[in-house]
């Protein structure tokens, strides 16, 4: 029976197997018991865990598994029925809990997987937020640099300083190797290198404005990358450079510079641009980032605004200098004009005395000669001399009065005077002249015309005499009518013009004087010039009449000084004319003093001029003066 021995000699003995199983079950039970303790510890440390009841169930499963292994230690030797029962209960409990845990994990595992998915999503979201925060920080940094550059650029209004500051600040902020500005030439056909940062090459080089790269930069409102071999990128020497740098270019609008003509600015007929070129260091692998290009674009816009402000300032300074020069020239011209006016006034003052004295003597002697026995030929010659002398005296007075009116030195002599006496004096001068031409003269004074008034008696009489004299002068036959009246308050609006605004008052009234004749009349086209000095109408019926053309011009100045308005109406040549003027006079309270008083006036000479003539003896002086005055009045 030796061949039936089946025990292999290399297999360990039963005691050794039992020993290994015993030790393994012990460590398995120890591990099973430690796992729930670890779960309980970490769950307690966690402030939030949604699956506590799952952990409790899982922990019970592990504890029961460990208990089965622990009870199994007593089953390797002879054991009682109680141990077998405990082992059976433990395994049944473990089986029940294990199945329940397995069924529960079917529902729990998808939730755990979704938690992991959400974790990955949150992680990706956090990374995206980190990138956005980095972009925001970059934008804030860019904005800070833009504000700094803008402040530096706008700290001055000198365009050369603006461009130099821009290049320096951009070079420092972006770490540029070179930065340059190409400005359009005066002809507008090329771009000229005007400013560089490092001054590595001499400014003044030009490139054609028709190059494709130039058109590409002009057509884009963004900063773009251009080839390093482009003519615009030739802003630093090429020797010793092996790594080509990245070059960016952006257009700089020249805003509104076409409105200014400033020294070396180009003459622009349309919107034009300069080009700013920026070069990164060639010894690095740097590339242009989007935020850097955006910074360059913003700075280019700020430079454009600053250059336009500088252009406006330069133009305003040039205009100010030109205005100062013009003011100096005007002041010099004003002084020269004042000197000329003073010289003219001095000349007129001398001529007033030097010409009137012999003229008065000629008039006086001519008047005396007419009182003597003369032949018809002699009388005709003397009358011609007297008429010419009177005309010359009138011209002298007109020129003197006009010069005073033009330089503003003539002032009205406001005083109370006899208004009716003025018209009587005028008639005493006009009627003898009209009688020679067989003209009838009539005067009509309104019943409500005040006896006295307050104003310039001399200028009023001179105005009426000038107009009446013209009426007699230009009338061959017919009559002359002078009408004087007071303008009613409710009729003042009829006389209003853009330059004349009469207003009623208790202290003054408006005198209306109208002088109508049946003379040669005035053509409609000549009416606008009748009050212009040295202007004379020349209709057919006016030929042969002499005059200076100053009479009506002086009358208009006098009427304006007296706060009035004058105008002339005529229906045409040969239909006569009517001159009307309205002046403002003051109301005089004391009328008794003017009942019988006539103010002696001499016309056309001024009130302070005396007629000087030969006086044979003192007793005959008064008689000679009366004879001179009578003859002088008749000869006007």
From Swiss-Prot:
Domain spans labelled Histidine kinase: 350-587
Residues covered by the GAF domain: 158-307
This entry's comment on the bound cofactor is: Binds 1 copper ion per dimer.
Summarize where Cu cation binds, as residue positions: 65, 69
Q: What happens when the gene is disrupted?
A: Dwarf, chlorina and half sterility phenotypes.
**Source domain of life:** Eukaryota
Q: What SMART domains is this protein classified in? A: GAF, HATPase_c, HisKA
Q: Where in the cell is it found?
A: Endoplasmic reticulum membrane
Q: What UniProt keywords are attached to this protein's entry?
A: ATP-binding, Copper, Disulfide bond, Endoplasmic reticulum, Ethylene signaling pathway, Kinase, Membrane, Metal-binding, Nucleotide-binding, Phosphoprotein, Receptor, Transferase, Transmembrane, Transmembrane helix, Two-component regulatory system
Task: Fetch the InterPro entries from UniProt.
Answer: GAF (IPR003018), GAF-like_dom_sf (IPR029016), HATPase_C_sf (IPR036890), His_kinase_dom (IPR005467), HisK_dim/P_dom (IPR003661), HisK_dim/P_sf (IPR036097), Sig_transdc_His_kin-like_C (IPR004358)
What is the protein's quaternary organization? Homodimer.
Please identify the protein, giving its name as recorded.
Answer: Probable ethylene response sensor 1
